[in-house]
Amino acid sequence: MAVRMRLKRMGAKKQPSYRIVVADVRAPRDGRFIEELGHYNPTTEPVTLEINEEKAKKWLQEGAKPSQKVRSLLTQAGVVEK
């Protein structure tokens, strides 16, 4: 089973917030996921970013591939180096 770390859209219309989740690559964007790693809200000032580093590192070691945006968020949080 191939898994990917990606964003799951939450929030109201025109006010998105996102959960950072680990999901099967075949699952829909807002569908079933395996585990939640944190959340990201780009609409607040300053931007809110919270990631459970232990869970993220565990999934990266198990072979989960982060999406492009999640990779940049993990770098920003200091979980992954550039």
Curated annotation (Swiss-Prot):
One example GO MF annotation: structural constituent of ribosome
Membrane-crossing ranges are none
What GO biological process terms are annotated to this protein in UniProt?
Answer: translation
What the entry lists under SUPFAM superfamilies is as follows: Ribosomal protein S16
Q: Matching InterPro entries, A to Z? A: Ribosomal_bS16, Ribosomal_bS16_CS, Ribosomal_bS16_dom_sf
Print the keywords alphabetically.
Ribonucleoprotein, Ribosomal protein
What GO cellular component entries does it have? cytoplasm; small ribosomal subunit
Pfam families in alphabetical order: Ribosomal_S16
Q: Which family does it belong to?
A: Belongs to the bacterial ribosomal protein bS16 family.
**NCBIfam families in the cross-refs:** S16 (TIGR00002)
Q: What is this protein called?
A: Small ribosomal subunit protein bS16
The primary gene name is: rpsP
